[in-house]
Amino acid sequence: MRPGDGNRVTGDSMSRRIVIVGGGIVGVCNALALQRAGHSVTLVDRTTPGRETSYGNAGVLSESSIGVLNNPGLLASLPKLLMGRSNSVRFSPLFMVRRLGWMLKFLSYCTTSRWQAAGRALRALQTLSLDQHKAWIAEAGVDDLLRYGGWTKALRTTESFEAYAGELALADENGVVYSVFDESQLRQIEPGLKPIYKKAVLYDETCGVSNPAALTDAYVAMFVESGGTVLQASVSGLSQGESGWHVGLDGADDLSPDDVVIAAGAWSAEIAGWVGYDLPLGWERGYH
């Protein structure tokens, strides 16, 4: 079974007991996919699934967000970013010092070839993901949550649009469908916007959901109806032995699965650290 296949699988391979740590949309989607691959899956979260970051996000289902942050133009803008003269990023100097090796490697990937390779990989992943979401949304009977109409990036100056040319070239190389609008056309399609934008790019195939929490709830319901288990408990420990994993829980009995998936968002690095992984994980600001 390829990842993202929405069909249930009775299984050609041996079923395994799997614990998913984290009940956001990523953890829930992992739970559904693994369950349909024939495995016995338990989803663990300290709160009701979908009530952390997955509750307050924009609900965008994109197949066009393929330009990674360490792009060829980042090095030129680095002095401005480091001196705090940009509203687009805030960072912790202490974090950067502690992760200097990782930061230098991150910057070493600011080349055109590596940026293009990352774009191709993201395009393949996002296209598959969008198709899967549409299939699961239909299966869950929550088509009313799905919103078509694309996603618009508005640019205030002609210069900023020209600087965006690299993103559009990457989109062209990967078959992303988009439309470019001038100032007057933008006012026609988005009359509520202030008249401060000179250009806009509409990514036509992008869609979204009106209520991300409701979508997560619908996926969880499918998971439970198919025999999945949801535990509301805090993960207090994680260790690996000869016979499998041990997951310590506060609020429920400990678990002993064959495999563990860590999908705990901003808390994933801490949990992974319990078993020896040192992940230089960063995260964006909270949404709510």
List PLM regions with ranges.
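N-terminal Rossmann-fold NAD(P) dinucleotide-binding loop
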Residues: 27-28
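Central helical "cap/lid" subdomain
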Residues: 47-52, 251-288
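Beta1/beta-strand and adjacent pyrophosphate-binding region of the FAD-binding site
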Residues: 15-24
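Gly/Ala-rich phosphate-binding loop of Rossmann-like dinucleotide-binding domains
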Residues: 31, 35, 222
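A conserved short coil-to-beta-strand element within the FAD-binding core of flavoproteins
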Residues: 183-189, 231-245
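Glycine-rich FAD pyrophosphate-binding loop
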Residues: 36-55
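Rossmann-like flavin
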Residues: 100-221
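Glycine-rich active-site loop/strand segments that organize a redox cofactor
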Residues: 56-124, 144
